[in-house]
Each structure stands twice: as C-alpha cells, then as structure tokens.
C-alpha cells in the first residue's frame, strides 16, 4: 500500500473493499443459518418459536418469512387486524418511501462475485420476502415506540398531578408569606454597631 502511494498508482483491488462508494452488505455471503430461519434450510436446526428480542405482545410477523408460512398452510397475518404492518398496501397507491425504505429498495448483491465489482441481482422472491420482513419488524418497532411514548406521557401527567399542591395549601402559603411574623426571642435581623 505504501509502495503504491509512492509510485502514484492505486493499490490492487481488494475483495471486500468498496471502490466507488458504500454498497449494501452482501447477505448471500453469510452462512445460510444467519440469513434464513430453520424452516427454509432442511439441514439446519429449527429456529426458536418466537424471536426473543421483542415481547410477545408486539409480534405480528410469523417466525418464518411470509412465503414459507403460506407454503406450510399457515395464515399470513396471525393475530388479527392490529398485527398488520402500517406500510404501503400492494393494492393501493404507493406513497413516497422513507430513506430506510429507499435503502431497502436498492438491489442487494447476493452472488459470490458481488464484491468483485459486477452488478448482480438477488434471487427472485428473496428480496421481496426480506423487504416484507423488514417492514413487519419496522411496524412492530413503531408500535412499541408509540406505546412507550403514550406510557411516558401518562406517567408524566400523573406525576404533575401528584406533586401539584392543593389550592388550600397555596392560599395558606400566600397568607403566611404576607403576614409579618413575630420575631420573639430570636436574634434581631441587624446587629447593633
């Protein structure tokens, strides 16, 4: 590298380093068990029944990608209408995408030669499942954030009401502050010269 800087030429391309700019992480180069659940790969151990990161009340996504659960005969949206993601609907007009969703729309290199510099496309169907999975997790996180914000606001209002003095106490403090109190046998305010 130092020799290349001295000669003025660029160093040889190293696999794994971006040349033009940052690229999305190639999920296909990971071990398949890190990308897919146990139901997708026949030789892998089964995935746990529910992800341990989210509380059970917020789970709306099935434990496997939607296409896998649909193939196994399970319902696509278990849990009723509350569990549906708040993302764009496939039959309605598509709103403008946020920055995170635009990043999801970018092609994800999944072929082994993806870092060599050539443009690659993900296998058909895989990208859609990953996007759907990401949208469902995003909807869960938004619901959790909304619930936490509502709970925080409720607690803040309760604390305000609990610490607010009664109107009688305010009146008493006002009257006692305006009345001159007898000094008694205490030391005078000003010491004599």
Curated annotation (Swiss-Prot):
Superkingdom field: Eukaryota
Stored Pfam families: PUMA (PF15826)
Cellular component GO terms held in the UniProt record: cytosol; mitochondrial outer membrane; mitochondrion
Keywords: Apoptosis, Mitochondrion, Phosphoprotein
List of residues that carry Phosphoserine: 10
InterPro entries: Bbc3
Biased amino acid composition, Low complexity: 71-82
Induction field: Up-regulated by TP53. Up-regulated by DNA damage, glucocorticoid treatment and growth factor deprivation. Up-regulated by ER stress in a DDIT3/CHOP-dependent manner.
Cellular location(s): Mitochondrion
Cysteines joined through disulfide linkages: none
Sequence motif: BH3, positions: 137-151
Main location class: mitochondrion
Family: Belongs to the Bcl-2 family.
Subunit structure: Interacts with MCL1 and BCL2A1. Interacts (via BH3 domain) with BCL2. Interacts with BCL2L1/BCL-XL. Interacts (via BH3 domain) with NOL3/ARC (via CARD domain); this interaction prevents BBC3 association with BCL2 and results in CASP8 activation.
Domains: entry comment: The BH3 motif is intrinsically disordered in the absence of a binding partner but folds upon binding. Folds when bound to BCL2L1. Also folds when bound to MCL1.
Function: Essential mediator of p53/TP53-dependent and p53/TP53-independent apoptosis. Promotes partial unfolding of BCL2L1 and dissociation of BCL2L1 from p53/TP53, releasing the bound p53/TP53 to induce apoptosis. Regulates ER stress-induced neuronal apoptosis.
Name the record gives this protein: Bcl-2-binding component 3, isoforms 1/2
Species this protein is from: Homo sapiens
């Amino acid at each position: 590298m130092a020799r290349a800087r001295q000669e003025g030429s660029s160093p040889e391309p190293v696999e794994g380093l971006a040349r033009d700019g940052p690229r999305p992480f190639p999920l296909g180069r990971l071990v398949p068990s890190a990308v897919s659940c146990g139901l997708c790969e026949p030789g892998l151990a089964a995935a746990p029944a529910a992800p341990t990161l989210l509380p059970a009340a917020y789970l709306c996504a099935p434990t496997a990608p939607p296409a896998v659960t649909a193939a196994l005969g399970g319902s696509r949206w278990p849990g009723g209408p509350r569990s549906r993601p708040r993302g764009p609907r496939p039959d309605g007009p598509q709103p403008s995408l946020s920055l995170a969703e635009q990043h999801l729309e970018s092609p994800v290199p999944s072929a082994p030669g993806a870092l060599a510099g050539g443009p690659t496309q993900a296998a058909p169907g895989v990208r859609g499942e990953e996007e759907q999975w990401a949208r469902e997790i995003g909807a869960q996180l938004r619901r959790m954030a909304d619930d936490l914000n509502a709970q925080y606001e409720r607690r803040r209002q309760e604390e305000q009401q609990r610490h607010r003095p009664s109107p009688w106490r305010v009146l008493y403090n006002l009257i006692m502050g305006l009345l001159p109190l007898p000094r008694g046998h205490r030391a005078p305010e000003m010491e004599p010269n």
